[in-house]
């Protein structure tokens, strides 16, 4: 049965126009983080920020330092503190896509940055796109067990790994390519499956294949293709992904179909990853 959506956050009348992105995450303390990449009247990207919104839908803060147009994020949440990795499209330079690490202190009343934000990866391709505004580093997935951050770089059409993501003091460049083959068509969202594999959505902005439209692709962290399925018969439908374990051997995947403006929920058996 279809669900009903309600508006959680909307800026007050007269506020500057926002450009909310897929840099969206919820902290365990109830605060919502969301990227904002506004444009001017000519469609030119302006300075972006990361907004902090409380559980009642009220903005209580924002961050801009070391953030150039936040496009997506991943969170390692310890309740009273968190590490947040933010991918940035940094418009203006076609090899300037980056990932910034923020260390946050979380209290009942707000969120603040500890220490200086650190750019831990850079050099990802960024390019304008008529449908998406811009293509660049997008989905992020963090493995706390190995301190590795995985990056879905849309314009590069590849998945990268960045080592020592939580501890490094400087940039690793782009990191290492772990997955890049004909199953990728502009990867966007990136999440872990319960078995440890990685799952990405193909936005079809790069090397689209009409025989493989709107695909969700699973692969191991060592770069072995596992499987794929499509969520829309047309290209450009696969967008955001959420996933959770709902039984001992069952994963529930929620996928945004951007063509139909729907959220599709699928239950799948969980196989063993690498």
Language model regions located:
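Surface-exposed loop and turn segments in beta-propeller and other repeat-based domains
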Residues: 2-18, 52-69, 113-132, 165-184, ...
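Beta-rich, blade/repeat-based domains predominating
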Residues: 12-32, 40, 44-49, 65-84, ...
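Short loop/turn segments immediately following the C-termini of beta-strands
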Residues: 36-39, 45, 78, 88-94, ...
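A short loop-to-beta-strand structural motif that recurs across blades of beta-propeller domains
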Residues: 48-51, 97-100, 158-161, 209, ...
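Beta-propeller domains
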Residues: 94-99, 103, 115-177, 185, ...
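Outer membrane beta-barrel transmembrane domains
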Residues: 189, 197-203, 208, 215-219, ...
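Blade-level signature of beta-propeller repeat domains, shared across WD40, Kelch, NHL, RCC1
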Residues: 237-274
């Amino acid at each position: 049965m279809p669900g009903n959506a309600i508006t959680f956050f909307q800026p007050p009348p007269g506020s500057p126009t926002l450009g909310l992105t897929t840099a969206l995450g919820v902290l365990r303390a109830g605060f919502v983080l969301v990227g904002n990449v506004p444009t001017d009247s000519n469609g030119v990207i302006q300075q972006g920020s990361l907004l902090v919104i409380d559980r009642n839908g009220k903005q209580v803060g924002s961050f801009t330092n070391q953030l150039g147009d936040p496009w997506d994020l991943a969170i390692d949440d310890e309740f009273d503190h968190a590490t947040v990795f933010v991918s940035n499209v940094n418009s203006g330079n076609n090899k300037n896509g980056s990932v910034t690490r923020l260390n946050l202190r979380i209290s009942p009343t707000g969120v603040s940055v500890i220490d200086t934000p650190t750019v831990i990866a850079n050099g990802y391709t960024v390019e304008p796109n008529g449908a998406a505004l811009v293509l660049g580093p997008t989905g992020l997935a963090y493995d706390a067990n190995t301190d590795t951050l995985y990056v879905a770089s849309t314009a590069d059409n590849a998945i990268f790994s960045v080592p020592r993501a939580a501890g490094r003091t400087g940039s690793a460049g782009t990191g290492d390519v772990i997955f890049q083959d004909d199953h990728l068509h502009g990867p966007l969202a990136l999440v872990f499956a319960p078995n440890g594999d990685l799952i990405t959505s193909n936005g079809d902005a790069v090397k689209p294949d009409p025989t493989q439209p709107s695909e969700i692709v699973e692969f191991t962290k060592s770069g072995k293709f596992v499987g794929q399925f499509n969520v829309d018969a047309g290209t450009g439908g696969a967008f955001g992904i959420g996933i959770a374990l709902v039984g001992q051997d069952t994963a529930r995947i929620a996928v945004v179909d951007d063509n139909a403006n729907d959220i599709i929920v699928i239950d799948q058996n969980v196989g063993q990853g690498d």
